[in-house]
A protein has these predicted regions:
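Glycine-rich beta-alpha junction loops
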Residues: 175, 203-206, 245-249, 272-276
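A short, small-residue-rich loop immediately preceding and capping a beta-strand
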Residues: 94, 102, 110-134, 138-147, ...
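Active-site-proximal loop->helix
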Residues: 126-183, 279
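Long amphipathic alpha-helical segments
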Residues: 2-46
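Positively charged, low-complexity intrinsically disordered leader regions
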Residues: 17-18, 22, 42-109, 113
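Conserved small/polar residues in nucleotide/adenosyl-binding loops
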Residues: 277-283
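Active-site/ligand-binding-proximal alpha/beta "capping" segment
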Residues: 189, 193-245
Length: 287
């Protein structure tokens, strides 16, 4: 994928939602076309609406707790004798993970759309936990679809979702894991889209969900850019930004403000589990 200069990362796709080559798009059944179009139209209005941006920023600061810290790891830097190592402490955010940015924005969108319910899927449970937190904050009823096997593996997060008032729906079809939870969640949304908003927990699925998630987590990158300039008085001549990669939501947010920089100055490095999908291999350097 060749990036276009001066264009935000969430707008790097073509008119059909493709992000270069075979990645992206909107592979959806006909029944989802209208809900997806409506959500796309609403989001494109809200992302430029000054009142909505002010509301988002208010909750990012006073509910999520932004900005999160940018901390030098002095002992590790000394141990390695050379590199100056820093950490962006996104774990300081309310709930302990970056998923809260996306969940909060989705609930704000749901309120603007006049929806009373939010529905989402989860695997490890963090996206579901954050959505249940945000739904409770904004007075929305919440339903989370989760594979039956994942429910057994992730009891603490399941308990947290229930404490926040969410209904956790076990999915027994297929592998009883995330992929099946996503399918069941989509089916439910198709039948209830008149009063229900769907939140996809990462940069996956139809293009609009990738955009909303990336737009939400980009807060991390905006903060980081300011903090780096404050620490070094400018963007250093040589810097490596290392982030974990799973669904892509944190990496998307962590890197989005730095895509216009020359790779010789800022190297973006993703660290992914060994059981990676082969689709990622041509696009991003991994260690």
């Amino acid at each position: 994928m060749k990036l276009k200069k001066k264009i935000p990362l969430i707008d790097q796709h073509n008119k059909n939602g493709f992000w270069g080559g075979k990645f992206g798009g909107n592979f959806i059944p006909e029944t989802l076309k209208k809900p997806i179009e409506d959500l796309t139209e609403l989001f494109e209005k809200l992302r430029y609406d000054k009142k909505f941006l002010k509301e988002r920023d208010y909750y990012f600061k006073n509910y999520i707790g932004t900005p999160t810290s940018f901390v030098k790891l002095q002992n590790l830097s000394d141990h390695l004798s050379g590199a100056q190592i820093y950490a962006k402490m996104v774990s300081e955010a309310n709930g302990g993970a970056h998923k809260i940015y996306n969940a909060t924005v989705h609930c704000l969108i749901a309120k603007k759309a006049g929806k009373k319910y939010v529905v989402g899927d989860t695997g490890a449970g963090y996206a579901g936990k954050m959505l249940s937190m945000a739904a409770k904050k904004f007075g929305l009823k919440c339903k989370i679809f989760m594979g039956a096997k994942d429910i057994k593996r992730q009891k603490p997060n399941v308990d947290a979702m229930k404490k926040n008032g969410a209904e956790v729906v076990p999915v027994y079809s297929g592998s009883q894991t995330l992929v099946d939870a996503v399918s069941e969640c989509m089916r439910y949304w198709v039948s209830n889209c008149d009063n229900t908003h769907m939140c996809v927990g990462s940069t996956v699925g139809p293009n609009i969900f990738v955009k909303i998630c990336g737009w939400s987590t980009a807060q991390i990158s905006r903060e980081l850019k300011v903090q780096i300039k404050s620490e070094f008085k400018k963007i250093p001549k040589k810097i490596k930004l290392i982030n974990c990669v799973g669904g892509g939501s944190s990496a998307y947010g962590f890197w989005s403000e730095f895509i216009d920089y020359d790779k010789k100055q800022i190297e973006l490095i993703g660290v992914e589990a060994v059981s990676y999908t082969h689709l990622t291999l041509p696009t991003t350097p991994y260690v």
